[in-house]
A protein has these predicted regions:
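N-terminal accessory alpha/beta regions
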Residues: 7, 17-155, 188-192
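Active-site substrate-binding loop specific to GH73 endo-beta-N-acetylglucosaminidase modules
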Residues: 83-92, 105-109, 141-385, 495-496
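Short alpha-helical segments and helix-capping/turn motifs at coil-helix boundaries
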Residues: 106-114, 147-150, 159-160, 214-218, ...
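Basic side chains
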Residues: 121-123, 208, 318, 437
Length: 496
């Protein structure tokens, strides 16, 4: 594989079939960190479609998403109560179509990765979206896509400490790990609950994952006391999407809900929602760091954890394993660690170090199923996803984005564990997972109508002789396409 495509395969999503190739691929790769990132996609399916920017009307902001999901939940309550106009199948579908964002956001994510001109930024976005996993528990489906776009992609050129804070406080994370209900054992909310004979207390899910997965990792040898104290720092953060009380017949208008939110947290902004009545009073100690009481304590905690030695070492290894090699060397990891320390966590400098190390490394890098899928579609010029204007239209042979990701076996909108998807190829090399790639390569050829032939693709990428021999052992163009896209070279199993 030529140098341009070797780097685009390892660090990006492959050049689109009609994109000129850069002469200085290293300079191009580093410049990609500051590429513009509009959400590009297609309105309707057509052969050799060209990406255009998604309209604002299908990209609601966070408050609009909150209001939509709240309305969805209240309409579901009206349905349960048997109210006229809410119980028919048409009404149920209309409620989902108008107020749920999960399926549309998955299509937008697919479009970005297929038509985007910021391929390296999108790969780093996927890495961090996986690092800060927020699996779909239904009630956060309106927020997962927003977190990816606004907490991660929008902050790729900033500092890791800022991204950590923005993801920790995002509705998607606070909902996913049940922090919205958490309250300190000595909080006013807990006292009131005990007086009423009810239960209210601390949930340590997010406190635990903040230490174990998002920052220092178990190598820091934190204790259960550290986890509990981190959870106490987090107590009070977040508001559950949708209906906001357990009252059986609560049916609030948007205005009434906002009034209630302001009373509870002083704001209607779910990304800055802190309930003082749920907060644990007093200072807390986490890994020796004393954290003050109140809303500002969380920023002090995340800043401390972001610059911790164990955080730097742990995430540098993850970056190296994801982009450089399945088995990164100590020098690979240290190169990223040194860039992190010298820049005090500046993501531009960290990502530049990753790029430099990936380019200098001759090791192959196996690609995730979703990364491979996007690369195949981009390389071939196929049109494999519906347009944003076709969400409710049946297109024979073209699955919805949600169905594609489910069948592929990887999606940021799946129900999944907080540790996310592994970057280790051993987790993806089963016969079943390989058979899925064969099926998708077949479907992309048969239903996506690739613009380029297998021979044209091999010439453009500079495929090696082993790959060419494999492809040429078949006579049918479809079989050649499948063999090429599922070859060890294109999957990242052998040196390109």
């Amino acid at each position: 594989m030529n140098e341009q495509f070797r780097i685009a395969h390892k660090l990006g999503l492959m050049f689109l079939h009609d994109t000129p190739l850069p002469e200085d691929v290293k300079a191009w790769a580093i410049s990609q960190l500051h590429a513009k990132s509009p959400a590009l996609g297609i309105k309707r399916w057509k052969f050799n479609a060209i990406g255009k920017e998604w309209p604002k009307s299908v990209q609601p902001n966070l408050l609009e998403r909150d209001n939509m999901f709240s309305l969805y939940k209240y309409n579901r309550k009206r349905e349960e109560m048997g109210l006229d106009g809410y119980t028919s199948e048409a009404a149920k579908r209309d409620n989902e179509r108008k107020n749920l964002m999960g399926e549309l956001d998955q299509l937008k994510f697919a479009h970005r990765n297929v038509y985007g001109e910021d391929q390296l930024k999108l790969r780093f976005t996927a890495f961090w979206a996986n690092h800060f996993t927020t699996g779909n528990i239904w009630d956060n489906q309106n927020h997962i896509g927003h977190a990816i776009d606004e907490a991660i992609l929008a902050n790729l050129n900033g500092n890791f400490s800022h991204m950590l804070y923005k993801m920790t406080t995002h509705s998607s994370m606070l909902t996913y790990l049940d922090n919205c209900w958490s309250c300190g054992e000595n909080s006013q909310e807990a006292i009131w609950a005990r007086e009423d004979g009810q239960q209210a207390g601390l949930n340590d899910n997010l406190g635990r994952e903040l230490l174990e997965l998002h920052t220092v990792s178990p190598t820091a040898k934190y204790t259960e006391s550290d986890i509990k104290n981190a959870a106490n720092v987090l107590a009070g953060w977040g508001i559950w999407p949708g209906r906001i009380s357990g009252e059986e017949h609560e049916l609030l208008s948007t205005e009434q809900r906002h009034t209630k939110l302001r009373k509870m947290g002083g704001t209607i902004n779910s990304w800055d929602f802190f309930k003082k009545d749920h907060a644990e009073p007093g200072t807390k100690r986490v890994l020796g760091k004393v954290i003050p009481a109140g809303k500002g304590g969380l920023k002090q905690l995340t800043d401390f954890l972001a610059s911790h030695e164990h955080t730097i070492n742990y995430i540098s290894f993850k970056l190296a394993q994801h982009f450089v090699s399945d088995n990164p060397s100590k020098s690979d990891i240290n190169y990223i660690v040194n860039a992190w320390k010298k820049s005090n966590g500046n993501l531009d400098q960290i990502h530049t170090a990753v790029i430099e190390r990936a380019i200098s490394s001759t090791e192959p890098k196996f690609q995730w199923p979703m990364t491979w899928l996007f690369q195949v579609v981009r390389l071939s010029g196929a049109t494999y996803f519906k347009g944003w204007d076709e969400m409710d239209k049946y297109n024979q042979g073209i699955m919805d984005a949600r169905e594609i990701f489910e069948e592929l076996g990887q999606s940021f909108w799946h129900e999944r564990q907080p540790n996310g998807y592994s970057s280790d190829k051993k987790e993806w090399l089963s016969g079943e997972m390989f058979e899925r790639r064969i099926r998708f390569a077949d479907a992309i050829y048969s239903k996506g109508y690739p613009y380029s032939t297998p021979d044209e693709i091999m010439d453009r990428i500079g495929a090696n002789e082993t790959t060419r021999s494999l492809v040429n052992s078949f006579t049918r163009k479809k079989d050649q396409f499948i063999a090429l896209m599922c070859s060890p070279e294109l999957m990242g199993l052998k040196n390109a």
